[in-house]
From Swiss-Prot:
Protein's gene: fnkD-1
Signal peptide: none
Domain named Protein kinase: residues: 33-276
Keyword Calcium carried by entry: no
A Pfam family recorded for this sequence: FNIP
UniProt cross-references to Gene3D superfamilies, sorted A to Z: Transferase(Phosphotransferase) domain 1
FNIP repeats: 301-342, 343-384, 385-426, 524-565, 566-606, 647-690
Entry annotated with the keyword Repeat: yes
Family: Belongs to the protein kinase superfamily. STE Ser/Thr protein kinase family.
Record's protein name: Probable inactive serine/threonine-protein kinase fnkD
Domain notes: The protein kinase domain is predicted to be catalytically inactive.
PROSITE patterns for the chain: PROTEIN_KINASE_DOM (PS50011)
Keywords: Repeat
GO molecular function, a single term: ATP binding
Organism: Dictyostelium discoideum
Length: 723
């Protein structure tokens, strides 16, 4: 039995909890969330890593991620949320964003998502017996660092928030990888509920002592005798840490202990790395890690590393002082997060294992070659790096790249298109089109950077950071096309959040990126045979394009096709059967084939359409045709939306299909009387007249049928005036 849980059951015999704050639940709408992965699950609740897709995004995570805890209604205890509210401003717990309920009354708690963290239960430092003398100072320093963090954070929760955790064990304390002085901070999770503050504060301190012993590799689960626990305190610890742990385990523990520990200035007595113990005696230090351990933090370690130094199974490795040469194969392939704060030796291809996903090299400033950074790395920190970058040095798996000291010209393609967050805090070179990848959403540049040229900042950027100040960008950068430049617009997800890039030269195959969905080329008039449009494109607008279309030239999944200048015969399957929105503003050539998928058709001012020529599938038709009184109005049997913006003459009886519900006529409509010929199906009518006065309104009142519920004249809705 776990002594921590057992002791909790023995001590916690009184329950006191009072809180008068009202809980406000929002509606939890499932379709507004995407579940990325399940983190934990039991009979009472399930915890997910989730992403907010729609509605207000209350997270501060760069990807919109947060932790969502779903609690079944029958197991919900409001004290859990009240605790979160009370701890809302405490930096040692997960940030609380809010709570919600679904239609089944299940409760959802929205919390901060920590990308890089390790439970303390998986962090153990166990030196081999043969090297324990050489390892003493390293071990003591690590214990000192972690102890100070734990004592400080727990004291803050007790003193500032008057809350007891009540469930302290290694699994409920996270070491969070961050950019603080020592590279980590502490977060407490999974607070127990219904715990009285005064009755149970000593329980937290006792359990903290057990956690410290367990972190040293000693077993606290087989004996509940406190004297036995004292015997578990490692002999090689310095006396002051033995005293700290002894105080925490004492039967006479009280609220003053944490204050006494902090007042003894343990946290301020930490030696700096430069003054810590030097290198051990000759020979290598072998650090054994338990099979179920993930993390290893060695702030003083600076010994040569061989293949036996670190055993396979280490997930997180932090060597703050290490600055020796690394050889291929000495870093275990199990490493996912690697931090080498002082390292500045040349990295040869293969030195960093392909398992690494987060790589932090804040002091590195040597030349990088292809393969120095392995494929698979997603977060790359090179704070001091200021060497030339060429194509393929930064792998295309990297999504977060921090180059705070970098100030070299960036060639096109040197930054991978996978990036979503980029820091160039010292960059003062001119930014050319296409240098900043198009999926970037967060960009950091110096305040005194070179002036931005058109298209140098992708319109997908939503956060621009300069000198630490964040500028929110809500709209795409306005395009100035006076010089007839080509520009390309694209979007990763939706058409209305497009990214805009300027192309100052001829468009090439390399200009069109994989994953492109929105594509607009303002002056493009080349053959698609020389420049295939990516199959991912769904929206294609080519204002100047006037080349013949043949089958299979256009992407098979395209939905919106806008060709305002196109004037060639349309035959066979030249228009893909996926198109639903089709625009030809200048077309007057033969239309032999339009796919039945088309719902919106715009044929501009030139094309003459005879009755029956429109497809039965067309629901919306727009044309600027200038009509004579004898000209029949084109329609299809299914047409519901008809826009004839140049129609300014008499409406003949039966001239408008009885299926049309929305009708737009010309801006100078002259025959108000003929409006009486509108079919009863029309409910929405728009047109323009020379003068809108009381007489005109009276005439419209006289001739427009009461079935028309919305009338807009000269862009002014007048239905209410008529009524």
């Amino acid at each position: 039995m776990d002594i921590i849980s057992t002791t909790f059951d023995q001590i916690n015999t009184h329950i006191k909890f009072t809180n008068q704050k009202k809980i406000e639940f929002q509606n939890h709408i499932e379709k507004e969330w995407e579940i990325i992965t399940q983190l934990e699950s039991n009979e009472q609740f399930t915890v997910y890593m989730s992403k907010k897709l729609k509605g207000p995004n209350f997270t501060n995570n760069r990807f919109g991620l947060c932790t969502v805890k779903k609690i079944k209604s029958q197991y919900f205890n409001e004290n859990e949320i009240l605790n979160h509210i009370k701890l809302r401003d405490n930096k040692y717990v997960l940030k609380y964003y809010g709570c919600g309920k679904d239609n089944n009354q299940d409760v959802y708690i929205y919390l901060e998502f920590i990308e890089y963290s390790i439970p303390i239960s998986k962090v153990k430092l166990i030196p081999n017996d043969s090297s324990i003398d050489n390892f003493n100072n390293v071990s003591n320093t690590i214990i000192e660092l972690v102890t100070c963090k734990l004592v400080e954070s727990l004291n803050c929760i007790h003193k500032d928030n008057k809350i007891v955790h009540g469930n302290i064990k290694g699994e409920n304390i996270l070491l969070v990888n961050d950019e603080s002085e020592y590279g980590f901070s502490v977060k407490f999770i999974n607070f127990s509920l219904n715990i009285g503050y005064e009755d149970s504060i000593h329980l937290d301190m006792f359990n903290l002592g057990c956690v410290l012993i367990q972190m040293l590799g000693c077993d606290c689960t087989k004996d509940e005798n406190i004297d036995f626990l004292f015997s578990k305190i490692p002999n090689h610890l310095v006396e002051k840490f033995k005293k700290v742990i002894s105080q925490l385990l004492s039967k006479n523990i009280n609220n003053q202990i944490l204050t006494d520990i902090i007042s003894n200035k343990i946290t301020t007595s930490l030696p700096k790395y430069s003054t810590l113990i030097g290198e051990p005696n000759d020979g290598l230090i072998y650090i054994g890690i338990q099979n179920n351990s993930d993390g290893l933090i060695l702030p003083l370690f600076n010994q040569p590393i061989c293949k036996k130094t670190f055993t396979y199974g280490v997930y997180y490795l932090s060597l703050s002082s290490f600055h020796r040469q690394l050889n291929v194969g000495v870093i275990p392939e199990s490493i996912h997060t690697l931090e080498l704060a002082s390292f500045n030796q040349t990295i040869l291809p293969g030195v960093i294992p392909t398992s690494v996903r987060t790589l932090k090299l804040p002091s590195y400033n040597k030349t990088l070659t292809q393969g120095s950074i392995p494929k698979g790395v997603r977060t790359l920190l090179l704070s001091s790096f200021n060497q030339p970058l060429t194509t393929d040095i930064i792998p295309k798996t990297v999504t977060i790249l921090k180059l705070q000291s970098f100030n070299q010209p960036i060639e096109w393609g040197a930054l991978p298109c996978s990036l979503v967050e980029l820091s160039l805090a010292s960059y003062k070179q001119p930014l050319q089109w296409g240098v900043i990848p198009y999926y970037i959403s967060t960009l950091e540049l110096p305040l005194a950077s070179a002036p931005f040229s058109e298209g140098s900042i992708p319109s997908g950027v939503s956060k621009l950071i300069q000198q630490g100040e964040i500028q929110q960008i809500n709209k795409p950068i306005k395009i100035n096309n006076e010089n007839n430049q080509n520009y390309m617009s694209c979007s990763q997800n939706e058409f209305d959040s497009k990214l805009t890039l300027i192309l100052n030269s001829k468009i090439t195959r390399e200009s069109l990126f994989f994953g492109l969905k929105y594509l607009e080329l303002s002056t493009f008039n080349q053959s698609f045979e020389t420049l295939p449009i990516p199959e991912t494109v769904e929206y294609l607008k080519l204002p100047m394009y006037n080349q013949p279309l043949t089958p299979k030239l256009l992407p098979s999944g395209i939905k919106f096709l806008i060709l305002p200048s196109f004037n060639h015969p349309i035959r066979g399957e030249s228009i893909p059967p996926s198109v639903i929105h089709l625009v030809f503003n200048k077309l007057f050539s033969v239309i032999e084939s339009i796919p039945s998928s088309v719902k919106y058709l715009d044929l501009g001012d030139e094309y003459y359409v005879y009755p029956g020529h429109l497809l039965h599938s067309v629901l919306s038709f727009r044309s600027g045709l200038k009509f004579r009184v004898t000209d029949p109005i084109p329609y299809s049997q299914s047409l519901t939306n008809l826009n004839l913006y140049n129609f300014n003459i008499e409406l003949l009886k039966n001239g408008i299909s009885s299926n049309v519900t929305s009708l737009t006529l010309g801006s100078n409509f002259t025959n108000i009387e003929s409006l009486s010929n509108l079919p009863s199906s029309v409910t929405n009518l728009s047109f323009g007249i020379t003068t809108l006065n009381e007489k005109a309104i009276s005439d419209i009142t006289k001739y427009v049928k009461s079935t028309v519920t919305t009338i807009t004249v000269n862009n002014e809705q007048i239905r209410k005036k008529i009524n």
